[in-house]
């Protein structure tokens, strides 16, 4: 009986010590794949392991291996604003434009002045142009027109 107990202990220790044990060897990054002769339906072939085995990685997303990174914690005390470049910051969304003075354009070239409330007429630019149109030489016109 002592010999039988000794045999069971040795067999138990051998299964713990053996490298292959009873599961297929692991492969890929962080040992998430398994080396098999043929990948299962829920697995994808990635690369070749030793002894002509395929490294198979599961297609189904496992949150054990693919964890999302934690969101950075932002404390309101850490946020500072620098208003040194703004001269007069009022906190309102109004622009620095003054809406008290408006120019009413009634006709082309005629505007109302806000001080006297009289129309001023400005002459539009003259339409006479003194540009000469030159024709290219006949040799170049034959090249440009097909």
UniProtKB/Swiss-Prot annotation:
GO cellular component term of the entry, any: extracellular region
One GO-annotated biological process of the protein: defense response to bacterium
Classification via InterPro entries: Beta-defensin (IPR050544), Beta_defensin_dom (IPR025933)
Biased composition (Low complexity): 110-134
Signal peptide span: 1-20
Alphabetically ordered keywords of this record: Antibiotic, Antimicrobial, Defensin, Disulfide bond, Secreted, Signal
Chain spans, region Disordered: 109-146
Subcellular location: Secreted
Family: Belongs to the beta-defensin family.
Protein name in UniProt: Beta-defensin 125
Species per Swiss-Prot/TrEMBL record: Hylobates lar (Lar gibbon)
Gene name linked to the record: DEFB125
